[in-house]
Each structure stands twice: as structure tokens, then as C-alpha cells.
Amino acid sequence: MNELVDTTEMYLRTIYDLEEEGVTPLRARIAERLDQSGPTVSQTVSRMERDGLLRVAGDRHLELTEKGRALAIAVMRKHRLAERLLVDVIGLPWEEVHAEACRWEHVMSEDVERRLVKVLNNPTTSPFGNPIPGLVELGVGPEPGADDANLVRLTELPAGSPVAVVVRQLTEHVQGDIDLITRLKDAGVVPNARVTVETTPGGGVTIVIPGHENVTLPHEMAHAVKVEKV
């Protein structure tokens, strides 16, 4: 796989990540997420716009075209199927899974994807609770259910009294922070875990699990965790 294709797919998936998190996709956000300079990002975005993969809207946010979204979905599908394989079969430590899946997402064929779906018993979510998109396009299974309607971000919980919730999704941005994802795992903050959360004065959130050390998330990371109220 050549470097140009890898870069294009990485940008598409990052825009998809931002959309999932409810963060406006701007070139500045891509620069932050991928640790690239502003000029480099602008040059790549311009090339992708010429290639018909995205549009730069009037307010400067990035919009995926139909062609770009289809490719972004395919890349994310490969990424999350790879995560399932790495966790469920290979047993790779949680903190290493995201970075490894970022490599696999660029080289996996659709034939391998279909075989993985069978081997993994038709998964619809990643080990981190995120829906695997584009399964219908692959012709192997249904889209994930519309359970997202019941989910809220930690930053959307009311301030004040502690709130009991069930952890449902840890987004790609959270997974990319190795120290944070390790602390969350060690504290038992994983999908389907019941925890208590309290909003901190600075807009962050403290997660409390009996028998474990509390974990405090800054606003940016708390926004990237979805939960369901108990």
C-alpha cells in the first residue's frame, strides 16, 4: 500500500472519528489528531477535494462526499474488525490495539473482512463498544442497531449529584491516548461496566468504581465517552 493511499485513508477516518464524537471536522482538528503541520494538512485536504473525496464548506468545516464517506466507512470497518481480531483471538493488550489496527486498516482486503466476520461470529461492535459500520455494504450482516439513541456523552450529564451509568463506547480518540486507555482498563472502565460519574468544576468528569482508583477525564476526553443512564 503506498504512502499516498495510507494518508488519504487516515484523513478520511479521522474526519469520520470527529463526526462520531460530535466534533466539527476542521483542518485544525486533523492537525492536532495526526500531529501534522497546518500547511501539510491544508495541502492534503486540497488534494482530497480535487479527488472528489470531501468539500470545504463555507464555514471551513470539512464535509465528506458520497465517495469519500463510502471509503471512510470501509476503512473504519476494517479498523474495528481488526480490533476485534486483535483482542478476541490474538489477545493483544488493550493499550496496543488501536495503533495496530491503524496499520491493518490500510491493507485488509474485503475477502479477508468477510472471513473475519465469520471467524468472529458476526460482531457488530469493536471491543471498545463502537459500532462496526458498513457491514451491509460488505454483504455479510446487518448494520448495528439504533441503540445510540439511548446514549449520552459524559459531558452531557447534569452537573451536581453523582450519576450512575453504564459505559457503552470509548471512541478512537480515547483509545489513541495510551496512558488514558490503560488507566481506564485498570480501573474497570470498559464497555458494559456500571460506574458512577461526577462532573468536575473545570468541565471534566470523575469516574468512580468501588474498589478502584478514581479516574478524572478532561472535558475533551469526557466528550469522547458515551454512556447509558441506569
Swiss-Prot record:
Gene Ontology terms: cellular component:
cytoplasm; peptidoglycan-based cell wall; plasma membrane
Q: Which InterPro entries does the record match to this protein?
A: DtxR/IdeR_SH3, DtxR_MntR_Metal-Reg, Fe-transptr_FeoA-like, Fe_dep_repressor, Fe_dep_repressor_sf, FeoA_core_dom, HTH_DTXR, Iron_dep_repressor
Report if keyword Transcription regulation is assigned.
yes
| UniProt subcellular location | Cytoplasm
Q: Which domain of life is it from?
A: Bacteria
**Iron among the record's keywords?**
yes
A GO molecular function annotation here is:
manganese ion binding
User: Which segments constitute the HTH dtxR-type domain?
Assistant: 4-65
Protein family per UniProt = Belongs to the DtxR/MntR family.
Subunit and partners: Homodimer.
The protein's name: Iron-dependent repressor IdeR
Which gene holds the coding sequence for this protein? Answer: ideR
